[in-house]
């Protein structure tokens, strides 16, 4: 019996299902994973903003305008990061006949590492924001310094997230 291409089709579909079942940065799930990463960054940044809103409210009511201004600046930086992440280029749509080259494993590892680093930076920002609230509540330490460190961390995260665009831009042209 001679096999036809239609006979092989179920086997090819099975192999595709196995490969797509891996929920890493595979072709079928790149955009979905990109969306999940961006949602996590936005969620964590929103937590930082919430902590800073609490600091701002308590310090403004208490008459400590210097700390309130620093918290307001941090809230603005959080808003900028949330906006940047929300409007950032989405990861790697790839049409068969487009001018975009396919990502290599090296490209994918670079993107995964970059995404992980951004999430770690935002998590450090959340920890700093929480520490600033704790510092105010216990009257220990310098809350203005901690708020300014939080602002610096979010600002650095914003710049680091912008580098992600360059990683994705490297995939835009075939070489």
List where the protein language model places each region.
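Charged linear interaction tracts used for macromolecular binding and regulation
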Residues: 51-146
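Leu/Val/Ala/Ile-rich N-terminal alpha-helices, chiefly Sec-type signal peptides and the beginnings
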Residues: 1-60
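Preference for long, well-ordered alpha-helical segments
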Residues: 135-175
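Low-complexity, intrinsically disordered regions enriched in charged/polar residues
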Residues: 2, 6-9, 13, 31, ...
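Arginine residue identity/basic-tract feature
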Residues: 13, 30, 38, 43, ...
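Residue-identity detector for glycine
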Residues: 3, 14, 21-24, 28, ...
């Amino acid at each position: 019996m001679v096999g036809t291409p239609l006979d092989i089709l179920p086997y090819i579909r099975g192999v595709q299902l196995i490969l797509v079942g891996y929920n890493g940065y595979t072709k079928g799930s790149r955009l979905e994973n990109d969306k999940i990463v961006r949602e996590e960054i936005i969620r964590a940044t929103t937590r930082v903003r919430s902590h800073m809103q609490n600091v701002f409210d308590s310090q403004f009511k208490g008459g400590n305008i210097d700390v309130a201004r620093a918290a307001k600046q941090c809230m603005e930086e959080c808003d900028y990061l949330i906006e940047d992440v929300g409007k950032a280029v989405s990861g790697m749509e790839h049409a068969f006949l487009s001018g975009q080259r396919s990502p290599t494993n090296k490209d994918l590892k670079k993107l995964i590492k970059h995404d992980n680093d951004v999430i770690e930076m935002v998590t450090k920002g959340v920890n700093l924001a929480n520490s600033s609230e704790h510092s105010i509540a216990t009257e220990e330490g310098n809350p203005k310094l901690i708020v300014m460190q939080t602002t610096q961390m979010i600002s650095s995260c914003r710049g680091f997230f912008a580098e992600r665009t360059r990683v994705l831009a490297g995939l835009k042209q075939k070489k």
